[in-house]
Amino acid sequence: FEDLSLGLSESMSHTITDADIKGFAELSGDRNPIHLSEEFAAKTFLKTRIAHGIYTASFISALIGMRLPGPGAIYISQSLFFRAPVRLGDTVTAKVEVVELMAEKCRARLACACKVGDEVVLEGEAWVKVPSRLPRPEKAA
């Protein structure tokens, strides 16, 4: 917790592949044909397959768990607003930024967003419990 400050941010990018979409469908059990069937998707207003929204959101989880705050961080809550679809071949850039710190509870509020190019496709906020550095035991003289 002591290493966090307002405005601190981290980001990562990932290009969505067919294997990503199929793998997430298998893991999650969400086999909605909008994700898996070009024939089905072509008949919808979207005209093509899209990635699962929660798969896109998982990049935020990866940032929180691995980079900011990082290992040991525990989700308390997450709000998500899906603004636009993510398609096969899109490169998603996820970003989290510290916008509030609650020192007494070792909690942080993070603004979260995913973009494809300049378009925000997902946004929201997360509250996380952040590990505090434990005091080091004093060495015996």
Describe the residue ranges of each PLM region.
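HotDog/MaoC-like acyl-thioester-processing domains
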Residues: F1-L6, V86-A141
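Hot-dog-fold acyl-thioester-processing enzymes
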Residues: F1-A73, P135-A141
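Short, conserved secondary-structure segments in the cores of folded domains
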Residues: L46, I76, F81-F82
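Generic structural detector for well-ordered beta-strands
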Residues: S11-T15, F81, E97, W127-K129
